[in-house]
From Swiss-Prot:
SMART domains in the record: STI1, UBA, UBQ
Residue ranges of every copy of the UBA domain listed in the record: 327-371
Protein name as it appears in the record: Ubiquitin domain-containing protein DSK2
Annotated Ubiquitin-like domain residues: 1-76
Gene3D superfamilies referenced in this protein's UniProt entry, alphabetically: DNA helicase RuvA subunit, C-terminal domain, Phosphatidylinositol 3-kinase Catalytic Subunit, Chain A, domain 1
InterPro entries: STI1_HS-bd (IPR006636), UBA (IPR015940), UBA-like_sf (IPR009060), Ubiquilin (IPR015496), Ubiquitin-like_dom (IPR000626), Ubiquitin-like_domsf (IPR029071), Ubiquitin_CS (IPR019954)
GO molecular function, one term: protein-macromolecule adaptor activity
Length: 373
């Protein structure tokens, strides 16, 4: 007698036949034949419990027609057998790893989407960017050259746009991006909302927006337009223009009058070029506390504001909307139902895990299984 068990993983579903006396490891091998997921990457959940390889299927009281949830995980970087065979090496590696705990912390259990690019697996099959594209000082991002046009043409490629949308739709990839960037980590759940925002995706695939962002990055460079002496040259040159040269002598009165006229003109024309330059309002010296930073003895960029960055990629209509005050059972109704189907019935833990993951069921599931909440 064999059991017909439904395997669920996100939106995917499979049916696997297995004998009740079979071990969970044999059960995973049958699943591998059905969907091709390696046995080492399978985590099976039934009634809120992770199935152990050495236990039998019938020991978990799994009946015919029941559903078992499959969570795909990454293989461990080092097996227990390898660690036991090299005790001295393992001890030294553990000491070395303890010295740099932040290098791989939170990397989604070793998830590295760029691993294949640094190996010989696809050597000769991928056309990598030219060497000067990412040259000194950022290459194409900081120089007005043909390399910048090459990058913009790549943004216009429908295949590239499709790949970007697919990447931002992958929860595991979003976790990797957030956990690899301290600034995104500081944003909390807003980082995931920003990366999933339609406006943010449009910006990544819109050549005009990319061009404006490059110009804005050059203008916000604290060293742009300033010589080694840090004199009176403007730190915010015109978009697309070269940084002004520093003169040997500086007329303080003339610079002051020029700054006042620039503030008046920017205030008069603020909004006239909003469609052409989405960052035009940020370049108004009257509203910019760093407008006269070039005359100071030392300059610096303002502190990173996660809330401000997240608000830049929110649709305008959301700015006037009130904060979502719905109770958790309404806000996370769909996600809570999925967790209940997997056997997680602790309401408080489920809500805490969903808030921690920004509403992602996959992230909440990892938090519940790892005991983070």
């Amino acid at each position: 007698m064999s059991l017909n068990i439904h395997i669920k993983s996100g939106q995917d579903k499979w049916e696997v036949n297995v004998a009740p006396e079979s071990t969970v490891l044999q059960f995973k091998e049958a699943i591998n034949k059905a969907n091709g997921i390696p046995v080492a990457n399978q985590r099976l959940i039934y009634s809120g419990k992770i199935l152990k390889d050495d236990q039998t299927v019938e020991s978990y009281h799994i009946q015919d027609g029941h559903s078992v949830h499959l969570v795909k995980s990454q293989p461990k970087p080092q097996t227990a057998s390898a660690a036991g065979a090299n005790n001295a090496t393992a001890t030294g590696a553990a000491a070395g790893t303890g010295a740099t705990p932040n290098m791989s912390s939170g990397q989604s259990a070793g998830f590295n989407p760029l691993a294949d690019l640094t190996s010989a697996r696809y050597a000769g099959y991928l056309n990598m960017p030219s060497a000067d594209m990412f040259g000194p000082d950022g290459g194409a991002l900081n120089n007005d050259s043909n390399n910048q046009d090459e990058l913009l043409r790549m943004m216009e490629n429908p295949i590239f746009q499709s790949q970007m949308n697919e990447m931002l739709s992958n929860p595991q990839m979003l976790d990797f991006m957030i956990q690899s960037n301290p600034q995104l980590q500081a944003m909390g759940p807003q980082a995931r909302q920003m990366l999933q925002s339609p406006m943010f995706r449009q910006m990544l695939t819109n050549p005009d927006m990319i061009r404006q962002s490059m110009q804005f990055a050059r203008m916000m460079d604290p060293n742009a337009g300033m010589g080694s002496a840090g004199g009176a040259a403007s730190a915010f040159p015109a978009p697309g223009g070269d940084a002004p040269e520093e003169g040997s002598n500086t007329n303080t009165t003339s610079s002051s009058n020029t700054g006042n006229n620039a503030g008046t003109n920017a205030g008069t024309n603020a909004g006239a070029n909003t469609a052409a330059n989405p960052f035009a309002s940020l370049l108004n010296p009257a509203l910019n506390p760093f407008a006269n930073a070039g005359n100071a003895a030392s300059t610096g960029m303002p502190a990173f504001d996660p809330a401000l960055l997240a608000s830049m990629f929110q649709p305008p209509v959301q700015a006037s909307q009130a904060e979502d005050t719905r109770p958790p059972e309404e806000r996370y109704e769909h996600q809570l139902r999925q967790l209940n189907d997997m056997g997680f019935f602790d309401f408080d833990r489920n809500v805490a895990a969903l808030r921690r993951s920004g509403g992602s069921v996959q992230g909440a599931l990892d938090s519940l299984l790892n005991g983070d909440v």
